[in-house]
Amino acid sequence: MDSCCNSESLETIVEEAIHLSSTDIHLQCGEPIYLRHGDGLKATQFVCTTTLIEDILRRCGIASYEWQSIDEACSCCGVRIRVHLYRANQTICGTLRLLCHQQLKLDDNSEGQLLQKLCESHDGLLLVCGPTGSGKSFTLACCIDYINQTMERHIITLEDPIEFEFKPKKSLIHQRQLGADIKSMSDGIRDALREDTDVIMVGELRDRETLEAALHAAETGHLVMATMHTQRAVMAVHRMISLFPGEQQEEVRNQISQVLRAVICQRLLRWNKKFITIRDILLNTHAVANLIRTRKEPQIISIQETQLPMKTLEMAVRDAKVQYGSQQQLHTLLDQQLS
């Protein structure tokens, strides 16, 4: 590895990131370390060194680093960290995402109660969507923790990498990592069907093969929970259908209309060192299922607007404005979510 200047330990850097409510740590060997703070990057007094990189690799269980990029996870200061290392500018660089270090617990409000009810389902597909950094993984982890605390279930998680570690409580939990324990997400789902599994958590539905396996699992009596990268709840329905060729889409529409439980699409806003979550909520009622089957997804929004507890992103923004009163800067931040 390249030689670099001296720096502080990973613990010191992570503690600084936590103190500043930063979400990401940016590394380039021999250069100052940057923290993602709000909407911008802030340079720190710390410098990235080979010792720091080697410590991160050791925590990830990796003996050496050559040319390939690395996606792993490790722990530091009681926080799980998603690690991405890569080469740029002829040296080693990295981005460390600090996964939410709050206690895993569903909110004590109507949305939290809705998620609890969805977690109690015995089958079907529950999607948590949103852009990068919107807290999708944390929400899914809270759902898994709720099931683990309250129900006797066999839970299998399929992740890349494992982000939140669970110890069995009322439930039996097996966590599998892509590359280490399974060859692909779709293989992991198919394996889970032969392992007397009740709940399957898929880190992300990225491709047709994974979605196909997830829909089959949801059809055959398993609760499947997964994330997708979409900006709106209704867009998740369109995204799933669009992953299949035209001649399969009618069959897939029927499948989705039968197994989909809900789509929760969320945004995470930072305000006064706290996080505000706003959620676009879509439940698969009979009316919604009929619109999915008959290729009328654009009309789903009108159902969201009139049938509680469903809501659109616009409604979620209005609710947040009412909740937080006359804080104009926050209102501006909320309005930006609609642009």
Q: Which residues does each predicted region cover?
A:
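Short, flexible helix-loop junctions that flank or precede catalytic/ligand sites
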Residues: D2-S339
